[in-house]
């Protein structure tokens, strides 16, 4: 083998190794992002978001922060993908005139009721951050904050950085960060995704 040919093979091997590292890094980054920002239930999300005139990526962000797409998730009083309390679910069921037995831990019920409730809050507050704060901390707390100049300049919009509950402030920030990720990422097969976490 000539020295020139050996040099060519060495250069080709180095080039292929670099390409492999770049491609592997991109795939590794994609896997890391999908671990940090999973998606599931795309068909249900797009369906119920559409029924309630919501951005499906906002709904994905709420689910991500509330339950990380784990349908069995529960806190001390909230259950399911969208972490509804029994009281909220009962209000939604009555307002929607639901006549069947429902399980708020069921993914479809959770997404259906959660989207309906989120739309209700957006209609009331006419501001997504304020609606998200109400979704997390309750309407009573948000109404109190809106009437206090420390938390709202106009009585309509909360100053997110001044929300007095650290959990709620963090919640609004996390939902917005997740929403930004989901709406700027290509999910070509979102409608076909019926529950598989990717």
Language model segments and positions:
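Short, Lys/Arg-rich N-terminal segment immediately upstream of the first membrane anchor
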Residues: 1-6
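Hydrophobic membrane-insertion alpha-helices, especially the h-region
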Residues: 7-25
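Catalytic glycan-binding domains that act on GlcNAc-containing polysaccharides
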Residues: 23-198
């Amino acid at each position: 083998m000539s020295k020139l040919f050996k040099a060519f093979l060495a250069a080709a091997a180095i080039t292929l190794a670099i390409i492999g590292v770049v491609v592997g890094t991109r795939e590794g980054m994609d896997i890391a992002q999908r671990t940090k920002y999973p998606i599931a239930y795309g068909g249900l999300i797009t369906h119920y978001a559409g029924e309630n005139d919501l951005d499906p990526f906002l709904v994905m962000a709420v689910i991500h922060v509330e339950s990380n797409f784990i349908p069995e998730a529960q806190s001390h009083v909230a259950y399911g993908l969208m972490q509804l309390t029994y009281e909220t679910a009962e209000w939604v069921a009555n307002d929607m005139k639901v006549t069947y037995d429902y399980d708020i831990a069921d993914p479809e019920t959770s997404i259906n009721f959660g989207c309906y409730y989120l739309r209700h809050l957006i209609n009331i507050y006419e501001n997504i951050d304020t609606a998200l704060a109400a979704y997390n901390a309750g309407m009573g707390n948000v109404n109190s904050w809106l009437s206090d100049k420390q938390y709202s300049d106009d009585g309509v919009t909360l100053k997110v950085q001044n929300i007095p509950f650290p959990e709620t402030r963090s919640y609004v920030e996390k939902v917005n960060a997740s929403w930004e990720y989901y709406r700027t990422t290509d999910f070509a097969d979102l409608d076909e995704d019926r529950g598989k976490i990717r």
